[in-house]
Amino acid sequence: MIYSDFISPQTQFYQLTVPFQLESGKVLIGVQVAYRSWGELNAQGDNGVLICHALTGSADADDWWEPLFGSGKAFNPDRDFIVCSNILGSCYGTTGPTTINPTTRKPYGVSFPKITIRDMVRLQAVLLEYLGVQSLRFVIGGSLGGMQSLEWALLYPDKVKSIAPIAVSGRHSAWCIGLSEAQRQAIYADPNWQGGNYTLDAPPNQGLAVARMMAMSTYRSWDSFTTRFGRQYDPSEKFAIASYLQHQGQKLTERFDANTYIILTHAMDGHDIARDRTAPNLSDYESVLGSIQQPTLVVAIDSDILYPPVEQQELANLIPNAQLSWLKSTHGHDAFLIDMAALNEIIQQNHEFVLF
């Protein structure tokens, strides 16, 4: 497995025994799902909690959300059966572009079919059925994970008791789509891209690093960068912020795949909870959000420039049984991965919306 160094030893794997059909009509054979679980499923199978990760995340939620785990915390293994799976199309154990195509015996690469957020959620549902989970107390996630939580409420309303979408919108904005496209173009401009048919020993790392640098700039905020870096120089006489972004770009190339980045950002751009559910106009979008009946804890980050708070306010206004809570932070979009004590407190204080 190509990125096995970044998959924890506790990760488990489930392989589907039947073909998995995507929304596009394309079919994947032998799909594998990488997942982690904590706690025990009760006899009724109704104490499930599903954590959905973001763009470059993995199933190791107890690593990237560690302060939220434990007795008296948002994720309590003594009470709940908690599951986090690596999403379809990723490179941390679940079938994606780096997976060997059983037909060609080579990695899928650029030939991996287009996927959607709904495809990701439907695969999670297959996994949970295999695990015996009958219903979920709540589904939670930030950013791309928040998109999944919204789709869970709409695709499986009888299985999901509550949801907690964090720092996300009901449909990807032109702002987000434009930023994603700029990042993809950076990858395409790398000579090693080769139309996506690069070898895994010579990937387009320069382009992927630049894409990550762009993304990191939107994951933080003006206050965050100004306070942390200002106009400081590092020992090599670069601006400290330039060194930081270059470091973050290099780090991603060591643990992530460019085709995977392309596939997942396209899936995010396609995010629209009203797509194919009703005619594509504003009133129908509003009616789809209005059809979500589950108690919903919407978390907005006041300094988020990627998914600005107006988008979470829209969710809270249109979902009938929703509560808007504010994660106040200078860290921008990534505050849900940085200010975790504050996030845990928000979840704990809103137990009527995140059902325990």
Swiss-Prot record:
Pathway assigned to this chain's UniProt record: Amino-acid biosynthesis; L-methionine biosynthesis via de novo pathway; O-acetyl-L-homoserine from L-homoserine: step 1/1
Binding residue positions for substrate: 212, 334
Keywords of this entry: Acyltransferase, Amino-acid biosynthesis, Cytoplasm, Methionine biosynthesis, Transferase
Keyword RNA-binding in annotation: no
GO BP term (any one): homoserine metabolic process
List of catalytic residues: 143 (nucleophile), 304, 333
Catalytic activity: L-homoserine + acetyl-CoA = O-acetyl-L-homoserine + CoA
Residues in AB hydrolase-1 domain copies: 49-337
Listed GO MF terms: homoserine O-acetyltransferase activity
Subcellular location: Cytoplasm
Pfam families: Abhydrolase_1 (PF00561)
Gene3D superfamilies: alpha/beta hydrolase
Enzyme Commission number: 2.3.1.31
Domain of life the protein comes from: Bacteria
UniProt subunit comment: Homodimer.
Function: Transfers an acetyl group from acetyl-CoA to L-homoserine, forming acetyl-L-homoserine.
Protein name from the UniProt record: Homoserine O-acetyltransferase
Origin species: Nostoc punctiforme (strain ATCC 29133 / PCC 73102)
Name of the gene this protein is made from: metXA
